[in-house]
Amino acid sequence: MSARTLDGKATAAAIKAELRERVSALRERGVVPGLGTILVGDDPGSQWYVAGKHRDCAEVGIASLRRDLPAEISQAELEAVVEQLNADPGCTGFIVQLPLPSHLDTDAVLELVDPAKDADGLHPTNLGRLVLNVNRPITTPLPCTPRGVIELMLRHGIDLAGKDVVVVGRGVTVGRSIGALLTRREVNATVTLTHTGTKSLDEHLRSADVIVAAAGVPGLVSAENVKPGAIVLDVGVSRVEDPETGKSRVAGDVAADVAGVASWISPNPGGVGPMTRALLLQNVVESAERALR
């Protein structure tokens, strides 16, 4: 068996095309969605991620509001910038790029973000609303990566109803939030949340119809612990040394041999990553649409 590819790049491009039409419709009504970013310091990786988000905005017609701040900024000064974006009608969603310098209280900064403008969908208020909402239509921003994982499968014709999904990883970005989306009645999957401390992790993996690997452990999921025909999504991000070049490279949680066992697999990079970026834009557009209702 050779796994088919869950192509995140092509799927994200399709979502962006849809968003361009929605942004155009909003502009006709006098509303221009705007994504704000707050970047503290000059970390090259963070600068690269933020620049990518603004390139995405340009592709679909979303306005960019970039706030690049010095690494030595005080807590009060940073919180004032957050409040400015909260109050700016041209900003329909924004993110605070993490990590922040160690002298800053990250939780306090993130909780200050207006939940209606929470482009990442990870504000405590929005996560709480998601947990409480099993049936009703979603009216708050959703976590981008979990939503991207599900959308990637749905747009490849995969029906998740009744599927046993094993999630590996307990971080807020994916592990703790994806179960709330997968178990909504409109999706109707059954979810087991595991992590690197789970006993008999191999047994859980071998029983799964779908595996979402988000532990940040290179090669954690291999062919020997995936049942034939399973669907495998690689969300893990780690840095390892390339033995041939000696340089650092990004590695996922899923070993290459899984492609010979699974029915579908998401590449890493090129799978869930582009979906996360596309769904961030969708949160910004949806916030603008909700403001008009």
UniProtKB/Swiss-Prot annotation:
This is Bifunctional protein FolD. NADP(+) binds at residues 169-171, 196, 237. Its EC number is 1.5.1.5, 3.5.4.9. Pathway: One-carbon metabolism; tetrahydrofolate interconversion. It catalyses: (6R)-5,10-methylene-5,6,7,8-tetrahydrofolate + NADP(+) = (6R)-5,10-methenyltetrahydrofolate + NADPH; (6R)-5,10-methenyltetrahydrofolate + H2O = (6R)-10-formyltetrahydrofolate + H(+). GO terms for cellular component: cytosol. Gene3D superfamilies: Leucine Dehydrogenase, chain A, domain 1, NAD(P)-binding Rossmann-like Domain. Belongs to the tetrahydrofolate dehydrogenase/cyclohydrolase family. It comes from Leifsonia xyli subsp. xyli (strain CTCB07). One of its GO terms (molecular function) is methylenetetrahydrofolate dehydrogenase (NADP+) activity. It holds the Pfam family THF_DHG_CYH.
